[in-house]
């Protein structure tokens, strides 16, 4: 990640909308509706699997660790993080990201101020930020 992006995020509260394939990061208390950065999961090379099965099963999780590692590196400079995910249970990438943090980045895990679920694929950046602010307020910040 570029240093200028990390400097924008450093010691600020941020929102991260995390899906299976990418995460967008905004400053929580900023008027801009444009994400500060995006982290994209590398497409795994799937062998012995039909194209229709790409996102089903274990092969789709191959590139998840490097994706979560890069996202954690970006968020590690923030003071507080609100995570917004899409879906429930194992399909919610936020839950899997938090599990990753529990094992690999406990200090960052402690700065997760709030989490939530929303239909982020159908929401604009502004709507995601507003939802994150609601979650932030509910968490007494």
Whereabouts are the PLM-identified features?
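Terminal alpha-helical anchor/extension segments at protein ends
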Residues: 1-141
């Amino acid at each position: 990640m570029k240093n200028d992006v990390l400097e924008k995020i450093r010691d600020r509260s941020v929102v991260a909308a995390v899906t299976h394939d990418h995460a967008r990061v905004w400053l929580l208390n900023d008027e801009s509706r444009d994400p500060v950065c995006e982290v994209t999961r590398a497409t795994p090379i799937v062998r012995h699997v039909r194209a229709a099965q790409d996102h089903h099963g274990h092969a789709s999780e191959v590139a998840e660790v490097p994706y979560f590692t890069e996202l954690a590196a970006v968020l590690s400079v923030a003071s507080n993080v609100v995570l917004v995910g899409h879906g429930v249970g194992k399909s919610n990438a936020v839950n899997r990201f938090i599990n990753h943090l529990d094992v690999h980045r406990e200090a960052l895990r402690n700065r997760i101020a709030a989490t939530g679920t929303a239909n982020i694929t159908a929401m604009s950046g502004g709507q995601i930020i507003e939802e994150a602010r609601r979650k932030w307020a509910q968490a007494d910040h």
